[in-house]
């Protein structure tokens, strides 16, 4: 009988020692990507490695905005990468309005920055782009084909 209080005290001590205030830390989900953007003269695409909280289309669009590759925030309606490595990206109407207002060089640089950044981030082979579920049409081009990596110098 004398052992029972000692055993109970020992069990209580072990239980209290196992309790801590530390919370489980989630695994680091940050991703390192290469963001492409235009030089000041809209003549060449430049690139820079940046860290984003996690690899997602929304975080990639935010990184493009931060580097000045796009001039305003753009919503991502949908994103899918098929078995062949082609990304199917549907952006909000703000992207269509923004790129349609560009000149030829500005459009090339913005499209190149977008396409190259996504292809590089996801190691994809191509990108099919839509705006609000429709083919993107600007004054310079109709983007009804799979876009591939843009050369850094046009």
Residue ranges and their predicted role:
Residues 4-8, 18-154:
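Bimodal "functional hotspot" detector
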């Amino acid at each position: 009988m004398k052992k029972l209080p000692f055993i109970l005290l020992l069990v209580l001590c072990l239980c209290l020692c196992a309790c801590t205030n530390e919370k489980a830390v989630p695994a680091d989900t940050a991703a390192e990507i290469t963001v492409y953007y235009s030089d000041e003269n809209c003549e060449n695409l430049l690139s820079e490695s940046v860290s984003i909280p996690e690899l997602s289309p929304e975080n990639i669009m935010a990184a493009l905005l931060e580097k000045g590759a796009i001039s305003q925030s753009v919503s991502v309606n949908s994103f899918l990468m098929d078995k062949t490595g082609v990304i199917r990206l549907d952006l909000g109407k703000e992207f269509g309005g923004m790129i349609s207002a560009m000149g030829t060089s500005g459009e090339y640089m913005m499209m190149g920055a977008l396409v190259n950044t996504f292809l590089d981030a996801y190691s994809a082979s191509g990108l099919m782009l839509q705006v609000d579920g429709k083919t993107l049409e600007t004054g310079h081009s109709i983007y009804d084909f799979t876009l591939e990596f843009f050369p850094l110098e046009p």
